[in-house]
């Protein structure tokens, strides 16, 4: 996404663990710390892994409660995915919502469509998962009425938005916006 500079912290060779490795790690941590509670710290949990790991946790009867960070995905428009996630112990998801305006999402290079966001929120909520959405106002090029669209989106979907965190846009030093400020109408002053 054009606002993000997380990729600067990744070193060459970063990779996602395979499902079998994750299952082994969960068992190890359960035994070592006598815990059922897990936070998978991936700022954008891959949809295929979300689907596969949820199913495996159920199959392995791990009896855990877990959370992670997700993007809204068109590949997750299947109610069974959310039922499996809940059955596996998923109880809370942090979603990168960013904006309730399609044009602004496109400026941010987010492939997400607003109808997919609504569907993901509804399905996960109906499955019993708490939804926390994160967004911000003031992205370069966003108009006042487009910022209002975010408020209206949240109000329209309040039955399925359980908590939220909004802030003002902060230009990250290594974000694509910082690398190409003129493309986004950003100018530096000294």
Can you describe what each PLM-predicted range is?
Residues 5, 38-41, 66, 133-135:
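Short beta-strands and strand-loop turn motifs
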Residues 25-29, 53, 120, 150:
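Alpha-helical packing segments of well-folded alpha/beta enzyme cores
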């Amino acid at each position: 996404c054009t606002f993000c500079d997380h990729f600067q912290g990744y070193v060459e060779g970063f990779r996602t663990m395979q499902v079998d490795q994750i299952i082994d790690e969960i068992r190890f941590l359960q035994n070592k710390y006598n815990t059922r509670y897990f936070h998978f710290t991936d700022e954008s949990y891959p949809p295929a892994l979300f689907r596969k790991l949820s199913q495996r946790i159920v199959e392995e009867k791990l009896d855990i409660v877990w959370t992670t960070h997700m993007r809204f995905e068109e590949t997750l428009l299947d109610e069974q995915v959310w039922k499996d996630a809940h059955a596996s112990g998923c109880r809370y998801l942090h979603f990168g919502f960013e904006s309730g305006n399609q044009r602004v999402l496109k400026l941010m290079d987010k492939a997400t469509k607003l109808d997919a966001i609504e569907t993901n929120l509804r399905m996960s909520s109906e499955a019993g998962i708490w939804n926390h959405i994160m967004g911000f106002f003031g992205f370069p090029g966003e108009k006042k009425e487009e910022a209002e669209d975010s408020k209206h989106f949240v109000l329209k979907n309040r039955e399925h938005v359980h908590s939220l965190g909004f802030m003002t846009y902060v230009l990250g030093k290594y974000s694509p916006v910082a690398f190409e400020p003129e493309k986004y109408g950003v100018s530096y002053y000294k």
